[in-house]
Design a protein with these regions (language model features):
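Beta1/beta-strand and adjacent pyrophosphate-binding region of the FAD-binding site
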Residues: 2-18
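Glycine-rich FAD pyrophosphate-binding loop
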Residues: 13, 27-47
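N-terminal FAD cofactor-binding segment of flavoenzymes
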Residues: 46-80
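Helix-loop-beta segment of a Rossmann-like dinucleotide-binding subdomain
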Residues: 87-104, 143-145, 227-230
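Short beta-strand to alpha-helix junction loop
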Residues: 95-115, 192, 237-241
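Predominantly flavin-linked oxidoreductase catalytic cores and closely associated redox partners
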Residues: 116-257
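FAD/FMN-dependent oxidoreductases across multiple families
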Residues: 238-320, 324-332
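C-terminal helical "tail/cap" subdomain of flavin- and related membrane-associated enzymes
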Residues: 319-397
Length: 397
């Protein structure tokens, strides 16, 4: 027998960055929210997990930043840029109410935000795989179906279905959310974790056809990553005996001084990542459904803004759904407003991402990085000035 046939306000498919953040905001607003994920937390995912200032602002506004720091993620207070062998170190300035950056491991961060959603009242169901979306005769999403970890069928009815299930979103496919912009998948990102070496802060190393970085994280380790054209990464794989050998060879070429330092420490994880990173924007809403996070917009990790995008868009969507559910705005108008706000917010950084993923000469790359920093600071200021959605009385039926 199918279970869970009570009609909820919202079911959120995907309990990581975008989904958990959206669910915790909607639960704070008093809605009956079900949050599901096929993983059982704590569980890791592919991510280099540095949170840009915009995302740190969101965590601070929602009251979660201290919990992230208390989890053992180090407060990052300086960034070192290296271009053509010349290094410059800059302090993280106090802007938009925050004076630090952070790069928590995803199995810790995602668990923390999902548990915050549950504490706010969301019904968190882990180990549940959603395989499809129920649509009525008019084409409106009315719920989702799938199975639990034991294979038992699960059906969840809801007034709204939110797809926060990542780049290869099943929700997006099920509702036919079309891609409205596709800028290709020419970039690759690979990373591994290293320990036994002191880390002073974030490091960004610009080289010919590569950007390499260091993100200090939990347990005195750092995420060491390299972004490069997909063609280069694939060629390195073909030349090497293993993924790890290819990664080491790429570091030797793009960041030799960092590679030398890494030999004094130890690698604590396999090398992982993506050899193709799509730059796509999907339609973000339709009758009874909406997409958030990578399900709606994904771009090359070279700008390190994916988590920040997810947290920004989670709030935009929560506000729009609140307006629709309490009748303050017509549903189509509210969700169209969400998509417009998302598209406007992502535009500059999306374009800069695509430009950086072309790996122009160093001087142009540095100029693009400066423009990226200005865009992030402007967005952070806008977010810091906004009111946090929070209304705990029951939502109207």
């Amino acid at each position: 027998m199918p279970t869970h046939r009570h009609r909820h306000d919202i079911v959120v498919v995907g309990a990581r960055a975008a989904g958990a953040a959206t669910a915790q905001l909607l639960a704070r607003l008093g809605y009956d929210v079900v949050l599901v994920d096929r993983a059982v937390f704590p569980a890791d995912t592919v991510s280099t997990h540095q949170i840009a200032r915009t995302g740190v602002v969101q965590l601070h506004r929602w009251g979660l930043l201290e919990a992230v720091l208390d989890s053992g993620a180090p407060a990052i207070r300086q960034v070192t840029f290296t271009v053509e062998g010349q290094s410059t170190t800059r302090a993280v300035k106090d802007k938009a109410g925050v004076d630090l950056l952070v790069a928590p491991r995803r199995y810790i961060l995602d668990t923390l935000v999902a548990e915050t959603a549950a504490a706010a009242g969301a019904d968190l169901r882990l180990g549940v795989t959603i395989t499809g979306v129920h649509l009525n005769d008019a084409g409106r999403a009315t719920g989702v179906y799938g199975h639990d970890a034991a294979g038992a069928p699960v059906e969840i009815d809801a007034r709204f279905v939110l797809g926060a299930d990542g780049l290869r979103s099943r929700v997006a496919r099920a509702v036919g959310a079309e891609i409205i912009e596709d800028r290709g998948d020419r970039g690759a990102t690979q990373y591994a974790y290293y320990a036994g070496i002191p880390w002073d802060g974030i490091e960004l190393i610009i080289a010919d056809r590569a950007l390499t970085g260091v993100f200090p994280t939990h347990d005195n380790q750092a995420c060491i990553w390299i972004c490069s054209p997909s063609t280069d990464a694939r060629a390195a794989r073909r030349r090497a005996a293993s993924r790890e050998d290819a990664f080491t060879a790429s570091l030797d070429r793009a960041a030799p001084e960092l590679a030398r330092r890494l030999r004094a420490g130890r690698r604590t994880s396999p090398v992982t990542g993506m050899l193709r990173s799509p730059n796509v924007i999907r339609r973000a809403h339709g009758p009874g459904w909406a997409l958030v996070g990578d399900a709606g917009c994904h771009r090359d990790p070279i700008t390190g803004h994916g988590l920040s995008d997810a947290y920004r868009d989670a709030e935009l969507l929560a506000v729009a759904l609140d307006e629709a559910l309490r009748g303050a705005a017509e549903e189509g108008s509210a969700l169209a407003g969400y998509q417009q706000q998302r598209d406007e917010a992502v535009r500059d950084i999306f374009d800069l991402t695509c430009a950086l993923a072309d790996y122009p000469p160093a001087a142009e790359f540095v100029d693009l990085q400066k423009r990226l920093s200005a865009a992030i600071d402007a967005e952070a200021a806008t977010l810091a000035a906004a009111s946090v959605p929070d209304r705990r009385e029951p939502a109207p039926a």
